[in-house]
From Swiss-Prot:
One of its GO terms (molecular function) is structural constituent of ribosome. Keywords: Repressor, Ribonucleoprotein, Ribosomal protein, RNA-binding, rRNA-binding, Transcription, Transcription regulation, Transcription termination, Translation regulation. GO terms for biological process: DNA-templated transcription termination; regulation of translation; translation. The gene is rplD. Gene3D superfamilies: 3.40.1370.10. Disulfide bonds: none annotated. The keyword Transcription regulation applies. One of the primary rRNA binding proteins, this protein initially binds near the 5'-end of the 23S rRNA. It is important during the early stages of 50S assembly. It makes multiple contacts with different domains of the 23S rRNA in the assembled 50S subunit and ribosome. GO terms for cellular component: ribonucleoprotein complex; ribosome. This is Large ribosomal subunit protein uL4. InterPro entries: Ribosomal_uL4 (IPR002136), Ribosomal_uL4-like (IPR013005), Ribosomal_uL4_dom_sf (IPR023574). Residues 42-65 are annotated as: Disordered. Part of the 50S ribosomal subunit.
Amino acid sequence: MELMVKGANALTVSETTFGREFNEALVHQVVVAYAAGARQGTRAQKTRSEVSGGGAKPWRQKGTGRARAGTIRSPIWRTGGVTFAAKPQDHSQKVNKKMYRGAMKSILSELVRQERLIVVENFSVEAPKTKALVAKLKELELNDVLIVTGEVDENLFLAARNLYKVDVRDVTGIDPVSLIAFDKVLMTAAAVKQVEEMLA
């Protein structure tokens, strides 16, 4: 199949990468797993046995008229432990390479179908100036966009750093979440070829 390249000849690409059916269940599973893996999972609270103190019985069992109590660190007491204390946990989910590649191909194919993937011969700015990048994006009628280049372009990265809803990444930096987070994805022809090789 062929992808239209703005201001250049069409680019021949693999149909298995850019023309496959959209597998919603697979994409959902991989995106959820990716987001889960980003969680810190470091929260921690103390149970009644971990809170310091509370060794002595606050008052005798009988004869005071008060409710019986065995420790001042009971969860129903102020400064007591937490009943079901949260503990650090690993939220990461296993995603096979085949599943990851399949999800990436599904997303890229859907971007092509929805005409949300724009391919250009090359994309750069001469100086790290946000104004220059805004002008370039205005020419292409883009404002909510992920820019994917073949290799890291520092000028482009610095120019986009202060723009809301604009992100610049090289091919190795893209993932399922970033591809679906933006309205449009702008890729250079070199990046398209690299993505194709990466997912082959």
